[in-house]
Curated annotation (Swiss-Prot):
GO terms for biological process: DNA catabolic process. It is found in: Cytoplasm. It holds the Pfam family tRNA_anti_2. One of its GO terms (cellular component) is exodeoxyribonuclease VII complex. Keywords: Cytoplasm, Exonuclease, Hydrolase, Nuclease. InterPro entries: Exonuc_VII_L, Exonuc_VII_lsu_C, OB-fold_nuc-bd_dom. Belongs to the XseA family. This is Exodeoxyribonuclease 7 large subunit. The keyword Transcription regulation does not apply. Its EC number is 3.1.11.6. Heterooligomer composed of large and small subunits. Signal peptide: none annotated. The keyword Chaperone does not apply.
Length: 451
């Protein structure tokens, strides 16, 4: 029997869930409906388990929530939170089935406000990049052997000690000028920019290091100041940035001519090793000596050549006398040759004057030339007239009525022989003669249809 069809029977009871089933359903519902999201709050009850997992609570003025950040995630965190820290976590809402507790599974953690700072950083970076402030084509090479280094940092900063230690190890005695400035805190960005501009105005050094040690994002924020980036880009002195650690990037790094991961690395990039400098000096000295020796040898060879070319005055006089004698001989020969040519010309003129034969020969040549030109002109005229006659014959052939009839046309004439040009001249009953290319026919008009 089907109880569902019996209206008198009560409906079946709903299924009964176990606690485990309920918690599992609740966890799945939470995880499917709520995505990864950012949550802000104050850290409390922080505990690092022996497994490496972090357990803590996030709270605000009216509520709190349990959180867990497993070891596989927290090993990438930039800091370890402590009770009282104000943080932001990116987490997935879930339910801990064993105790039925609502919790957040943290994927990443950052100090509160870091997201807003990063957004401001990205916006300012895009703006300055659009202006060409970070254009790689504008980056300048560092001098290979600087005579003086400038350092923009705090006198109390560990970065200054790191720079001086590295320079003392690599290049003892290299002059260093400090341009002191606060490197964090309110107004630090403007003071750093002022120190960079002062170094450029004073023009005391060849390379400028802008540096500070590592720290939180807020500690390094002064080096993301727009004024600092613009001062570095406008500096007449090449700038090396060494801010924070290798993973830290600031706008100062993008604006600088060269970015170093740490202050120590900045000092190393800006200074040569003393031994390398000595080896370079020795190499240049050796090249200079070799060049000097080659130049000296070339000069000696030239002196020998010039000495061999020197001639005793008596020998020079004999050479001049010989040259004069040769010129006199050439002049005498030229005069005799000119006299001979003139005598020959006079004889030819006399012969032409006394004999008419030459005149007759010239006239005969002229007549022969004119005859040849007349023959060529007659031949050209004959050819031209032949072409003209051919064109006229072709035109006459096209106009010949027989040729027109041969293309399918016919000539209609009245009985009196008049050619019919217009249907309006015809009347019904008129007799017509129609001529074809071959033969003719007689016809009579039944009706005329003039246009």
């Amino acid at each position: 029997m089907d109880w569902s069809e019996d209206p008198g029977m009560p409906p079946p009871a709903p299924p009964v869930l176990s606690v485990s089933e309920l918690n599992r359903m609740a966890r799945r519902a939470l995880e499917s409906q709520l995505p990864l999201l950012w949550v802000e709050g104050e850290v409390s009850n922080f505990m690092r388990a022996a497994s490496g997992h972090w357990y803590f609570s996030l709270k605000d003025a009216t509520a709190q929530v349990r959180c867990v950040m497993f070891r596989g995630r927290n090993q990438f965190a930039e800091f370890t939170p402590a009770n009282g820290d104000h943080v932001e976590i990116r987490a997935l809402p879930s339910l801990y089935e064993a105790r039925g507790e609502f919790q957040l599974g943290a994927e990443s953690i950052r100090r509160a406000g870091a997201g807003r700072l990063y957004e401001a950083f990205v916006r300012l970076k895009a703006k300055l990049e659009g202006e060409g402030l970070f254009d790689p084509a504008k980056k300048r090479a560092l001098p290979r052997f600087p005579r003086c280094l400038g350092v923009v940092t705090s006198p109390q900063a560990a970065a200054l000690r790191d720079v001086l230690t590295a320079l003392g190890r690599r290049m003892p005695g290299l002059p260093v000028i400090l341009y002191p400035t606060p490197v964090q805190g309110s107004g630090a960005g403007a003071q750093i920019a002022a120190a960079i501009r002062a170094a450029g105005t004073r023009a005391e050094c060849d390379v400028l290091l802008v540096c500070r040690g590592g720290g939180a994002l807020e500690d390094l924020w002064a080096f993301n100041d727009e004024a600092v980036a613009r001062a570095i880009a406008a500096s007449p002195i090449p700038v090396v940035s060494g801010v924070g650690h290798e993973t830290d990037f600031t706008l100062a790094d993008f604006a600088a001519d060269l970015r170093a991961p740490t202050p120590t690395a900045a000092a190393e990039l800006a200074s040569p090793v003393a031994e390398e400098m000595l080896r370079a000096l020795e190499r240049h000295a050796r090249l200079l000596r070799q060049h000097h020796a080659r130049r000296q040898q070339a000069d000696m060879q030239r002196l020998d050549y010039l000495a061999r070319r020197l001639i005793h005055p008596a020998q020079q006089l004999r050479r001049r006398q010989l040259g004069i004698a040769q010129l006199a001989q050439r002049l005498h020969g030229a005069v005799r040759a000119r006299l001979t040519r003139e005598q020959l010309r006079i004889a030819q003129l006399g012969e032409r004057r006394t004999s008419p034969r030459h005149a007759l020969q010239r006239q005969q040549q002229v007549l022969e030339s004119l005859g040849a030109r007349a023959a060529r002109a007659a031949e050209s005229a004959r050819i031209g007239r032949g072409l003209t006659l051919a064109r006229l014959a072709s035109s006459l052939a096209h106009l010949n009525p027989d040729n027109v009839l041969a293309r399918g046309y016919s000539i209609v004439q009245q009985e009196n022989g008049a050619v019919v040009h217009d249907a309006a001249t015809l009347r019904a009953g008129d007799g017509l003669e129609i001529r074809f290319h071959r033969g003719a026919a007689h016809a009579r008009v039944e009706s005329a249809q003039p246009e």
